[in-house]
C-alpha cells in the first residue's frame, strides 16, 4: 500500500508544482498591464498630509474653507438634482447640461479665489482645490456635447480628483 501511495503522491506533487508555476508565470506576465481599477486608484491616491506651523489665523481660514465647501456642496447638489430630473423627463439637452455645469464650476472657482485666506496652509488648500476646478473646466470643454449619462464623461470626472481629495484631507487634518 505504501508503494502505491508513493507512486500516486509523487506525480501529483510534480503536477501541482507545474500548475502553480504556470499560474505564477501568467500573473507576472500581466502584472505590467494597468487595469481600469488601477487607473482609478492611481487617480484617487492622495499625497501625504503636509505639516504647517500653527498660526493665530488658522481658525479664520478653517472657517472660511469649511463654509466655502458647505456652500459649494449645496449649490452643486441642487444643480445635479435639477440635471437628473431633466434627464429622467427627457428634457435635458447637452447644451443645457454643459452650460449649467460650466456656470457651477466657474462660480465655485470664483468663490474660492475670493476667499481672504491668511495662512500658508489655507492658501495651499485653496490652490489644490483651484487646480481641481481648472482641470474640471478643461474636461468639460472637451466634452461639451455630452450629457449627464455619458460614460466617458463620468470616467473623466475622476481626473484630478486626487488633488481635491488631498485638499479635503489636509483641511480635515488641520
Would you name each region that the model predicts?
Residues 45-46, 76-83, 101-112, 140, ...:
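Extended amphipathic alpha-helical scaffold segments
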Residues 40, 61-64, 68, 75, ...:
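Stable alpha-helical elements in mature extracytoplasmic
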Residues 25-96, 170-174:
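Immediate post-signal-peptide N-terminus of mature secreted/exported proteins
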Residues 97-157:
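Long, amphipathic, charge-rich alpha-helical segments that form helical bundles/coiled-coils
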Residues 2-12:
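Bacterial N-terminal signal peptides that target proteins for export
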Residues 160-174:
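Short, low-complexity, Pro/Ser/Thr/Gly-rich segments in the mature regions of secreted, periplasmic
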Residues 19-22:
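C-terminal motif of bacterial Sec signal peptides marking the signal peptidase cleavage site
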Amino acid at each position: 500500500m505504501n508503494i502505491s501511495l508513493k507512486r500516486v503522491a509523487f506525480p501529483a506533487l510534480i503536477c501541482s508544482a507545474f500548475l502553480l508555476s504556470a499560474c505564477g508565470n501568467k500573473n507576472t506576465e500581466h502584472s505590467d498591464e494597468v487595469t481600469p481599477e488601477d487607473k482609478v486608484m492611481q487617480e484617487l491616491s492622495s499625497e501625504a498630509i503636509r505639516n504647517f506651523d500653527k498660526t493665530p489665523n488658522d481658525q479664520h481660514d478653517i472657517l472660511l474653507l469649511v463654509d466655502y465647501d458647505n456652500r459649494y456642496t449645496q449649490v452643486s447638489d441642487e444643480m445635479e438634482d435639477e440635471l437628473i430630473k431633466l434627464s429622467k423627463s427627457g428634457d435635458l439637452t447637452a447644451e443645457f447640461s454643459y452650460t449649467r455645469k460650466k456656470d457651477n464650476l466657474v462660480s465655485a472657482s470664483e468663490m474660492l479665489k475670493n476667499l481672504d485666506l491668511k495662512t500658508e496652509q489655507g492658501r495651499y488648500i485653496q490652490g489644490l482645490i483651484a487646480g481641481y476646478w481648472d482641470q474640471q473646466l478643461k474636461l468639460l470643454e472637451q466634452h461639451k456635447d455630452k450629457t449627464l449619462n455619458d460614460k466617458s464623461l463620468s470616467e473623466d470626472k475622476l481626473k484630478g480628483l486626487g488633488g481635491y481629495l488631498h485638499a479635503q484631507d489636509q483641511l480635515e487634518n488641520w
